[in-house]
Design a protein with these regions (language model features):
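Acidic, proline/glycine-rich low-complexity IDRs
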Residues: 2-72, 93-97, 103-240
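A sequence-level detector for low-complexity, Ser/Thr- and acidic-rich stretches
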Residues: 78-79
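Amphipathic N-proximal alpha-helical interface segments
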Residues: 84-85, 90-98
Length: 240
């Protein structure tokens, strides 16, 4: 075996150890942060069989997990893996994966039930669909760096009926600032964005469609002034 071959193997093992260290530190730092916000379960929400093996989008390290954070009056569900460092051999950049994680904070008390039941809840389904969209999107972080506040639409999700328009469409405002959750989090390679998700009423969705970026910003400001912020209240009046 030549010296170059030995050096190549040594370098590969070193890179693998470094990748493992950064992955573990990333997971730990995210959990430590969420523990400052509320009580984090010891277990995570994940799949028995990873969807990426069945045609689903690949997450940076392959981990597709979610966590629950219980606060006094609300519960947060958050993605946990979109900001893992890339593990594939061809990905050599020292980045924190997609550079962001999503979360939804809700006042639905049923979210405090057994963790095994959470995957059947509409809030988890909403977070899951958003996370899969981000995993599949090549430059979602760049969009948030440019616009701060974005919106997205879904169909065929079993959210409370007053958030669904006559065509079965559901609007979500992304990036409304929280008074308690930081907008960013420092991880080993770089800081990532923590992106909130807030369900919109049909009137609010129509306003965003008509007004575009300005409408999204104005609606986010209205939520701030109303002190509902980023939180999805299961029962609330439309602000438009």
């Amino acid at each position: 075996m030549g010296y170059l071959s030995l050096f190549s193997k040594w370098k590969q093992k070193k890179q693998e150890k470094e990748a493992e260290r950064v992955l573990e530190e990333s997971i730990s730092k995210r959990k430590d942060y969420w523990n400052t916000i509320g009580h984090v379960d010891g277990d995570v929400l994940t799949h028995l069989l990873n969807p990426m093996f069945f045609g689903g989008p690949a997450w940076p390290s392959g981990r597709q997990t979610f966590i629950r954070v219980q606060k006094t009056e609300t519960v947060i569900l958050a993605s946990d893996g979109l900001s893992d460092p890339f593990q594939s051999p061809e990905e050599k950049s020292r980045t924190q994966g997609k550079g962001l994680e999503f979360y939804i904070e809700c006042d639905d008390e049923s979210l405090r039930g057994p963790l095994s039941d959470i995957q059947d809840h509409w809030a988890f389904d909403l977070l899951y669909q958003m996370s899969q969209n981000a995993a599949a999107h090549p430059n979602m972080l760049e969009l948030f760096m440019k616009h701060d506040i974005l919106s997205i639409e879904f169909t065929d999700l079993d959210v409370p009926s007053h958030f669904v328009n006559e065509n079965g469409e559901i609007g979500v405002l992304l990036g409304v600032q929280s008074p308690s959750v930081s907008a960013s989090l420092s991880l080993p390679y770089e800081s990532i964005k923590l992106i909130s998700m807030k369900l919109l009423t049909p009137n609010e969705l129509e306003y965003v469609r008509e007004q575009g970026a300005q409408g999204r910003r104005q609606l986010a400001e209205t939520f701030q002034l109303s002190k509902s912020y980023h939180i999805t209240m299961t029962k609330r009046e439309s602000l438009i």
